[in-house]
Amino acid sequence: MRAVLLRLAGFTGLPLVSILTPFLLIPIVSRVAGEGGWSTVVSGQAIGAFGGAVIAWSWNTLGPVEIAQNPSPQHRAEVYRQSLRTRLVLSALVFPFVFILAWQLAAPDHRLDGAAMSLTTAVAGLSPAWYCIGAGKPALLATFDALPRVAATIVAVPVILLTTHIWLYGIILLASVGVSLVIFHRIVVPERGKTFASRGGTWQYLRQHFGPAAISLSGTTYAATPVPIGQAFVPNAVMAGFSSADTVYRFGLFSVMALGNTFQGWTLEPQDASPKKRHTAAIVSHLALGLAGAAFLAILGPLATEIIMGSVNKAGQLTCALYGLSFLFISASTPFIRNLLLPQGRQRLILVWTLISAVIGIALMVLAATRGWADGIALAMALSEAILFLGLLMPGLRLLRKA
């Protein structure tokens, strides 16, 4: 238990700084952008999040398992080399796509802002976080994933205040992340000249791991679509508050990710402690986090958005409550997916339920958006997350009993 507490401190305490730092930027961006520009910025980030999932492919789900189960430095270096080859190929395709899509959906006066913000989230697909998680090294995660974002945000605050150009944040962040990735590569891959020497297996890897990647992509698709769908059909004045609720919700999801990072390596590593007890601890912890997050969003969400984004961008009570339900279900389903089903090769089951929930969720979102019902979009997302959780609950519990 001491080991997991140390990991919890590392994987939550250190990245917590990077989670909170953007709150320095949000009040500035939301006020500089105004109603129309704020929803454009959030829409661009959501589009980029989908692009980031494409770039990451299957590495965020299978990568930590591969690293955790084989401690050989040579093996880990080769795994990271393969990941870099595949992700750079995908980046060359994804970056232009998300930039153009965000540009097209943006408010006319904020096209460059929306397009640039799409790149700030798409670049997350190149993050080495999955490697650090599998290796159980939160200090690496903080140094090469959290710190570059913190530094970029601190630099961007005075730049945006002085220039009122939101798009400059995208350039600053991309530069910061790029430098950190080069340094990280030199640390984990000490042998020079081999990273790009073997390119033949890149497309083969992408084909072989399409299943796990599809799970991540389909899940990210419906998670990232609420604001872009609303942006296409709902007036900007209405979408301003909705976008604020979406932003607070997505910052909250970092806590789910951090807790999942803490438990994934711990539950999968060979240990004397009972696997069932470790899995149960992860499930209970995620459920408690989900309930706490849902309560916060439902009760304090409107106040938080008013303080952070300004009264003109304040989210409604119902919108926040529905986002709270989504938070609960996504937190509760995380340990079943990451710690039980995926390591046991149940990718097809996860993919089927993810696609079912995504299709239903997106269809209901579009239906609500075309009728101008913003809260209906949030309701559709909550329903889709509930469907996914319920569909995976019993298979996950059966695996837990066998652990």
Predicted segment positions?
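Interfacial segments at transmembrane-helix termini and the short loops linking adjacent helices
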Residues: 35-39, 102-117, 299-329
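Helix-loop junctions and terminal segments of transmembrane helices
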Residues: 56-71, 248-273, 340-343
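Hydrophobic alpha-helical transmembrane segments
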Residues: 111, 115-121, 143-192, 356, ...
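Membrane-interface junctions at transmembrane-helix termini in multi-pass inner-membrane proteins
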Residues: 121-144, 327-353
